[in-house]
Every structure is written in C-alpha cells, then in structure tokens.
A protein has these predicted regions:
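Short HxH-centered metal-ligating active-site micro-motif
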Residues: 8
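Surface-exposed loop/turn motifs in large extracellular/passenger domains
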Residues: 1-2
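Glycine-rich hexapeptide-repeat left-handed beta-helix
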Residues: 11-12, 19-21, 25-135
C-alpha cells in the first residue's frame, strides 16, 4: 500500500494493497481494495467501496455507500442490476489472491481464496514477536 502526503483516513476505513495519492480523504467505513488507485485529492465518502483495480480520478468524489468500479470509473448503488457484472470485470479474486477460478464457480473460488489467505497467515506461525506492547 502506498499513501501520499496529507492523506486522511477515517476510523474503521480499510485500505488493502492500494495506492492513495496526495491530499485524499478516505472517510469512516470506506474500503479501498487491492490494485485501486485514488488520484490526488480524491474523496471516498462514508461507507463507499472502491473495488479492485479501480482508478478514481484526481479530485473525484465517490458518494456515500456506493461502489466504484473500473477504469474508466463507474459508480453504482448497492442494488444496481449491472453491479455483479462490473464486479466480475474488476478481477478481485485474481488481484487479491491470485485465484483464477471461473466467476460462475463461486464455491471453489471462495475456497481457493481462503486457502491462499490461510497459507499467507500460516507462513507467520513461527514469527518472533518483537514487542508485545503494554501489559494487560
């Protein structure tokens, strides 16, 4: 993940493997997924989702509780009938997990993604904790 200068990230926002250029505002509860790019001065409002591999242009405002997908960018409301096809085009499973399972085979795709994540976490099983933080 890359964060530019003067970026504000609100409480409970999630940023995963994305690029956030300078002077962006990521509001409370917003989510920015892997491979997404927020251009300089972009705003992602409360509860909005910027999907994988999406490019949000500089100074663009992603409205609250919407889903931004693609390059060029399109913004969808949660109930939009075109949203599933837009999400499929974002290639989230491939970008986030390296999984290339067919979109229609949802169970296998989710299982494959969970296996990848479990292996990533498992690779840290023997890590040494350098600082456990304050005593509780």
């Amino acid at each position: 993940m890359l964060l530019g200068d003067h970026v504000f990230v609100g409480p409970h926002a999630t940023l995963l493997g994305c690029t956030v250029e300078a002077a962006c505002y990521v509001a409370t509860g917003a989510t920015i997924l892997q491979g997404a790019i927020l251009g300089t001065g972009a705003v992602v409002a409360v509860g909005a989702l910027v999907h994988a591999n999406t490019v949000v242009p500089s100074e663009y405002f992603v409205p609250p509780n919407t889903i931004a997908v693609g390059d060029p960018l399109r913004v969808y409301s949660p109930g939009n009938e075109q949203l599933p096809d837009a999400i499929r085009s974002a290639s989230f499973a491939r970008t986030a997990f390296g999984v290339r399972t067919a979109w229609e085979d949802r169970v296998t795709r989710y299982r494959d993604g969970a296996e990848v994540r479990a292996q990533e976490f498992g690779s840290h099983l023997e890590d040494d904790i350098l600082d456990a933080g304050p005593e509780r």
